[in-house]
Amino acid sequence: LHFTDPRFWIWLYQMEHEIRQNIPIMYYNIWDDLPDPLYNTNFYRSSDMLMSISKQTYGINKRILSKYGYEDWQTKYVPHGITDRRISKIEEKGDTKFKEFEAQYGLDKYKFKILYLNRNIRRKLPGDVALAYKHMMDKLTPEQRKECVFVWHSAPSDENGTDMKAVCKTLLPDYPVIFTYDNGGSMNDEQMNYLYNSCDVYINLASNEGFGLGSCEMLHAGGVIVVNVTGGLQDQCGFKNEKGE
């Protein structure tokens, strides 16, 4: 069983004939966007079974492999799962530990919190999210602005992304932003659950998105998501076809 982008596994595919004589190869895969990546055809054909993380990927696998005699059991839709033991809606937010968490990060000072929880890379469009926050705040009254905050839970700067502290200093000099990494860096499972439950809306404007674990976890915590209709994010939006499926 292997996973992630096929380009990392070319060495495996080069000897797939020898391997598959004794051991089946399974690929847990995802692809962000259309059109179908026909250049991956031979990579897909190097596996005996392909399990797709998103419905879009499942369609891609089926369309590409249909002409090569792959049977239904060889392509399956197997989405990511979220366990209640890790992420769940907190019904009683008066809990002492929850309130201490909010106070630690300054989240208790605001009534409306917008969460960015993605890698700081270009295709996630972090600067666009900050700009959207600015446009929203510009339309509010001064009193309403005091109740809102942009919560950034990711590396503030990344060589593959954006210097978000510089962006926010320039673009949002008068609007509040909380950089959680200023207060301890990454969080454990309990803290992550508190973060989702503390925030009101999760936003992901990525131009291409394989699945979108953050938005799925936010839904699991009973929150609201704002997302682009792309890749696996479509699976979370509740869209149905003409058959209601």
Task: Pin down the residues of each PLM region.
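Nucleotide-activated donor-binding/catalytic signature segment of Leloir-type glycosyltransferases, i.e.
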Residues: 18-19, 161-190, 194, 243
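Conserved donor-binding/catalytic core segment of Leloir-type glycosyltransferases
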Residues: 103, 107-124, 133, 150-151
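Extended catalytic core of nucleotide-activated donor transferases of GT-like folds
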Residues: 1-49, 55-56
